[in-house]
UniProtKB/Swiss-Prot annotation:
The keyword Transcription does not apply. Forms part of the ribosomal stalk, playing a central role in the interaction of the ribosome with GTP-bound translation factors. GO terms for biological process: translation. It comes from Pseudomonas entomophila (strain L48). InterPro entries: Ribosomal_uL10 (IPR001790), Ribosomal_uL10-like_sf (IPR043141), Ribosomal_uL10_bac (IPR022973), Ribosomal_uL10_bac_type (IPR047865), Ribosomal_uL10_CS_bac (IPR002363). Part of the ribosomal stalk of the 50S ribosomal subunit. The N-terminus interacts with L11 and the large rRNA to form the base of the stalk. The C-terminus forms an elongated spine to which L12 dimers bind in a sequential fashion forming a multimeric L10(L12)X complex. The lineage of its organism: Bacteria, Pseudomonadati, Pseudomonadota, Gammaproteobacteria, Pseudomonadales. Pfam families: Ribosomal_L10. CDD domains: Ribosomal_L10 (cd05797). Coiled coil: none annotated. This is Large ribosomal subunit protein uL10. GO terms for cellular component: large ribosomal subunit. Gene3D superfamilies: 3.30.70.1730, 6.10.250.2350. Keywords: Ribonucleoprotein, Ribosomal protein, RNA-binding, rRNA-binding. The keyword rRNA-binding applies.
Length: 166
C-alpha cells in the first residue's frame, strides 16, 4: 500500500521527535509475531514510557538522521520495529528482551545508547541497567554499610581504650 508524501513526512517528523528526546533505542524484527502479541507489547511499552513503532526503513533512516541513533542505519533491514526509551535507558531493551522470551520469531537486531552501537548479543548490558530508584538504593546500601562499619570500628576502639585504662 502506497503512503502519501504528506503521511511520510508526518511519520518522519513523529519518529524524529521521539528520537530527539530518547535516551536509547532498540531495533527488532517482528516478522511472524501475532497482532495480539504486538498489541500487548505496545500496551506494555506505553506503561514503561517506551515509544514503539513499525517504520519503513527509508523513512526510519531519514527520521534518525542528525540524531545519536543514526549509527543504527545498518540495522534497518527487513521489517523494522523501533523502540525509544524516554524515561530509563534500559526500558526498551528490557521490554524487548522479556517479549522475545515468549516469541520464537521475534528477533532483536541492535541497540544504541549514549552514541554507541550495541549488537544484538550486547543488549543484556543495556537491559540490566538499574533504574534510577534501584541505583539510589544500591548507593544508599553502600553508604550505610560503610558508616556502620565505621561506627563498629570506633566502638571497638573505645572499648579497647577503656579496657587498657582499667
Amino acid at each position: 500500500m502506497a503512503i502519501k508524501l504528506e503521511d511520510k513526512k508526518a511519520i518522519v517528523a513523529e519518529v524524529n521527535e521521539a528520537a530527539k528526546v530518547a535516551l536509547s533505542a532498540v531495533v527488532a524484527d517482528a516478522r511472524g509475531v501475532t497482532v495480539g502479541a504486538m498489541t500487548g507489547l505496545r500496551k506494555e511499552a506505553r506503561e514503561a514510557g517506551v515509544y514503539v513503532r513499525v517504520v519503513r526503513n527509508t523513512l526510519l533512516k531519514r527520521a534518525v538522521e542528525g540524531t545519536e541513533f543514526s549509527i543504527l542505519n545498518d540495522a534497518f533491514k527487513g521489517p523494522t520495529l523501533i523502540a525509544f526509551s524516554n524515561e530509563h535507558p534500559g526500558a526498551a531493551a528490557r521490554l524487548f528482551k522479556e517479549f522475545a522470551k515468549g516469541q520464537d520469531k521475534f528477533e532483536i537486531k541492535a541497540a544504541a545508547f549514549d552514541g554507541k552501537f550495541l549488537a544484538a548479543n550486547q543488549i543484556d548490558v543495556l537491559a540490566t541497567l538499574p533504574t534510577r530508584d534501584e541505583a539510589i538504593a544500591q548507593l544508599m546500601s553502600v553508604i550505610q554499610g560503610a558508616t556502620s562499619k565505621l561506627a563498629r570500628t570506633l566502638a571497638a576502639l573505645r572499648d579497647q581504650k577503656e579496657a587498657a585504662a582499667a
